[in-house]
């Protein structure tokens, strides 16, 4: 048997096992009928024309540069006029990539360096701000963007802690009052196959939803070893993906995509989480490289979530939502309870399940379209709830305890320093260990 067929068989076995286990629980565990939790979107292939939209980018790393190229592809008359970052070499690389790939030149006097550089972007007569810094900074920068009455695209997640989530929610409400457009980086909501699958599930294609299963198991992403001459802050910023206070840990920074998909399809957030995790092979930073979390929903249903960033293991990025009449992978296919395909996404001129529309671009097409048609869309609340759900799972794993949604929402724990400068960072950078130690000889066997 080839590795591919062996893996396919394993996934099929896992699916059957999961469905059988959930079915044994019975109808009493049903979550609810899938309700629309997000306004239906009529996709367009390109945003309409209009007056020049002046865009400023905050965070010139790979994702920020990518988001800038994506919005330039979204429609006509879009111009990048300002850039901000704390690292000059990141700024220089971004400018070089924009010049090479999009023939974009940003004037020197509109390229700002420093922790307060985002404020200078907001003061530079932009219409739109793209926020792509490490997520620790998102709440503060989003609040300032809304206060400046600028439309905002912000990458996921919305925050790294509960105070940050509450800030995103408050700023989101203010954005609604100002009739601003806010789009988040939870891109599957802007992916055409996902959207059509969601529409069908909303209309009862799999019956009432019982449970879900999510996987984001991949290899290690990247890390940046500290170099001589770097301060604590510079070393952490350059290695931000591996530090809890900057990224939120990978269940928050990456697996939030799966978590958001399940919240979207079920139309509700969990009531509590239990879980575990650990650190087996991560090289830098202070966070885990694997999590297993079970989220419990109001009517007894569960979402079994697993994520891992370790090389040399079996990779899988998938979602499964199970209903009383079938199940779906959420992205392009619906099955009956026997595993027979009853529907698969089909786009004209494309293979089944495939789309020619890149969701990284589509989210910006939708964003610009909302701005130019004066039909504000605001995704702040849903990215905030998905972020808090991820944080809930993280803290359940860190502590080994059952943590309630309301308890997490009210948490006062804030990650990271309160002042930002290229120097020492006064935080307790220790990898979390759940439970209590086997101390005082309580577990010592004497004979």
Language-model segments: residues:
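A structured beta-alpha segment of the ubiquitous adenosine-cofactor-binding alpha/beta core
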Residues: 102-131
